[in-house]
Amino acid sequence: MSAGKRSAAGSARSDTATSTVDLHASLLPLAFLVGTWRGEGVGGYEGLDGFHYGQEITFAADGRPALGYVSHTWWADEPRDGREPGSPLATETGFWRVQPGEDGKPVVEVMLAHPFGIAEIYVGTVTGTRIDLDHNVLIRTATARDVTRSVRLYGLVEGCDLAYAIDMEAEGKPMQSHLSARLHRVSD
Ligand code: HEM
């Protein structure tokens, strides 16, 4: 990935993300994420029937040192449990930022809020176009589902699609896959 052009103000426009807004220089390692992505994923968990879902994610840069993030999902399977194709599923929103690590490598910090009583922070690494969010703390309300930990992996596949996998430890069950998806870019 190219380092992009830096302006005197300390912000930069990425050569890889063709966003028309300035990308803060600290976010260059995440430049490949900027834009809107859409696609399909599969979900499941121990004791849960597998399902398909649709998803749209936007990573937005506005010149400040964090990307805004919002994800919407919808049911993409046969009707089940009162859900029809297109019925809204999980939404999450938050911010992604990059800080210099002790060894000089960029550290990614991701703050997410979920509408079902859970907020979480991930800390991880970015290596080229692969992001490992492997440290996670999660807080939840007394009525939220019993999720204790989660890890995520994001990356570009075949140079253009955004793929991710999310594993979680929930309801006393061991860490295992809950979601994975592959999304294509629909706008910069
Ligand atoms: C792409 C985003 C997501 C989608 C499409 C999704 C979808 C689903 C669906 C369809 C179910 C089963 C039906 C239901 O109980 O509602 C489910 C269960 C669950 N989800 Fe998610 N989910 C998403 C994100 C998350 C996240 C971020 C967490 C945790 C922070 C989470 C935690 C859970 C838990 C704990 C269960 C119950 C598992 C069990 O019954 O043992 N989900 N999810």
From Swiss-Prot:
Binding site for heme b: H178
Cofactor(s) needed for function: heme b
Catalytic activity: peroxynitrite = nitrate
E.C. code: 5.99.-.-
Biological pathway: Nitrogen metabolism
Coiled coil location: none
MF (Gene Ontology): heme binding; metal ion binding; peroxynitrite isomerase activity
Family that this chain belongs to: Belongs to the nitrobindin family.
The protein, known as: Peroxynitrite isomerase
Protein source organism: Frankia casuarinae (strain DSM 45818 / CECT 9043 / HFP020203 / CcI3)
Lineage: Bacteria, Bacillati, Actinomycetota, Actinomycetes, Frankiales
